[in-house]
Amino acid sequence: MKKRLQQLILILFLPFMTFHSLVGQDIIPLPSQVISAPGFFYFSGGTNINADKNIVIPTYLNNYLKQKQATLNSKGVQNDILFSIANNGLSEGYELKITTNKIYLTGNDEKGLFYGMQSLIQLLQHQPLTNGSITLPCQTITDQPRFGYRGIMLDAGRYFQPMSYIKELLDIMAAYKFNTFHWHLTEDQGWRVEIEKYPKLMSKSAWRSETVIGHHNQKPRVYDGEKHGGYYTKADIKEIVAYAAERNITVIPEIEMPGHATAAIAAYPELGCTGKDLEVPRDWGVKEDVYCPSEATFKFLEDVLTEIIPLFPSPYIHIGGDECPKKQWKESALAQSVMKREGLKDEDALQSYFIKRMEAFLKTKGKKLIGWDEILEGGLAPDATVMSWRGIKGGIEAAHLGHDVIMSPNTFCYFDYYQSDAPGEPLAIGGKLTVEKVYSFDPIPDELPAETHKHILGGQGNIWTEYISTLPKLRYMAYTRMLALSEVLWTPVAKKEFLPFAVRLNKHIDYWKTKNIDFANHLFEIKPTLTSREEGLEVTLTPLVPWGEIRYTLDGTMPKSTSAVYVNPLLLTQKTVVKTQSFVQNQPKGNPISIDFLPHKGLQAKILSKTTPSKTYKGAGERGLINGISGSKDQFNDGEWQGITPGETFSMKLSWTDKQAIKGIQFHIYNDPESWIYLPSEATIYTSQDGNIFSKACETKITEDKDTKTLAVDIPCKIKSQFIEIKIPAIGTIPVNRPGSGNQAWLFLDEIRVY
């Protein structure tokens, strides 16, 4: 009992304590191995840095160590830090050995030495300065990365970022051992790179007249009336590439093709299929204007790449390849003539032809091609590397074909998603991606055979910027989840554990706050688990991390330090508003959570059968659609909404112990065409006398409402029955001229109220 109490105290107060013996465990990403030893090294003004002659200490690291009062010295003395390179072992690996009078940092190569320096900096950052020195416990850290590609993508197309923003992002990347910066430089909404041969790309394509305010799906749309844009000169790009290189980061440019090209076509209409004059779009979403596969277009793109390639030493050039609508190609005589000439069976094959031509050109320049997973459509270019974003399916397919893969699935790696269900979260594109879920990501899927693992180069987090226009918001949306991803990509799977990571993460968040850099901190939030029972709704409250205690109210008021402490699950039997929050030492922490329970007849029903939702969007489980809880109005991935697998019709059959006097049924549906989620056109209620044979009782037609994201559909239906069935078919194939056209539409449902 005494031992258990000691463990509990450790868990509760670990985030607020400093344990010298665990100092190596403060590092993010967690090293492969940390072995403690007796004694301490005292880092002070008397500490000298001694490096081999061929080692160049980066300027910024030099400056950091000087701030810590260390002295650069070529002669080894007591209290030294010794830098060396072994030129053996796995690339990027290192050993950091701290003894009582010396610190030995040995890199397997220059990259390994650099990452060892990052670990040393973290050790110094997280130890207090006492009497003019920092005390570091003796230990040996042996470390190397799990994956060779550890990337972050920044979208400069939607919003142009000043150089200072990018440099800060690169600093954070370097500190947490990311080694690749994927720079998304062209988009429908803006062209961001200087091309001397095509000056209108800078004068026209780089600027839009104004920008939509609020979410893209909000209607009517409102605009800010302010011209926005900018581009990076070749000198700017060289400066960023050099800045990144000093931090061991390779910069990969992305020049989008054949889709996401409206900004370029606005400057040079002959590149498109219609020849119409266009403006750079003021709002978001996939646009139908794409490059037409003419020789003039290929000449333009080759000219662009010819100017781009010398700026970037990276072996790769990213050509996009995603979300390319085929409508204009279907209608274009030129595109159809190319298909006939090349013997291409459809527009997917035309896209493949387009990508293969660009890959062949890049090969002549000594570069390799990366594309988003849509480049698989119609046949993959011979040596292309696939960046899998639409889940992991594309990555698995490419690996089976023998192609290299960078895993970047939106469900784990899109940092423009919401981080929490809490009210007051800043506007995001939608969905939800918690730091815990990012941490659970494994770039190597279980279903991938061992012999294909070598093709998984690593992973990448993506910062799409439709809703990220400022540096503070970029920090809030990206940095915390970047730290989780850094450990995914560096640390051995067997060493990963979320709770110890959360302890370290909390310390790092606090450290950066002292530098006036605010990370999001959702570690103190509470996860409610809702279980629908015949007698009501059972609410189980679980903290993300077990620090402090949970307090709650049942009357809709905010919890205080004197509110009830949560001990056991709550059973709600009547209309109730639960509010709950974490408290540490009687102080509220994290965001409060609200649960609005509205009971109805469906809670007492037995589910005879129900369409199984997609594994990705299964909501609150089997009874989640009749649990008395409504989902978010702006997040379809909030844990309540259920996504029906595209192509399926939703059906749910309910039964009661006796006949029920029912007045009608109400359900909520989600409307987000940009995410391929469409409103259904109809819904039908059926009744049965025996639970086997059902007949139509009531139906309703659903009119598309473009002005709302969630729609409540009410079906008045006065019946008395023991058995009912609700059927809601998805619209099927997404029509032409709509986002996702040609694909099967998603249907998302929320609470089905039987009243």
Regions found by a protein language model. Give the residues of each.
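Aromatic, loop-rich ligand-recognition surfaces of beta-strand-rich domains
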Residues: D634-K696, E704-Y755
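Short, compositionally stereotyped local motifs that mark structural "simplifiers"
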Residues: P492, K496-S651, Y670, L679
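Flexible, acidic glycine-rich loops studded with aromatic residues
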Residues: K368-E374, G379-A384, R390-E538
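Contiguous, structured surface segment used for ligand recognition
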Residues: G24-F147, K473, L489-L499, V503, ...
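Active-site neighborhood of glycoside hydrolase catalytic domains
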Residues: A264-P269, P281-R282, K287-P382, W389-E397
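Surface-exposed loop/turn motifs at beta-strand-loop junctions within extracellular Ig-like
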Residues: D109, S582-N586, A730-G732
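Feature activates predominantly on carbohydrate-active enzymes
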Residues: G89-F298, E302-Y316, R357, F361, ...
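Bacterial Sec-dependent N-terminal signal peptides
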Residues: M1-D26
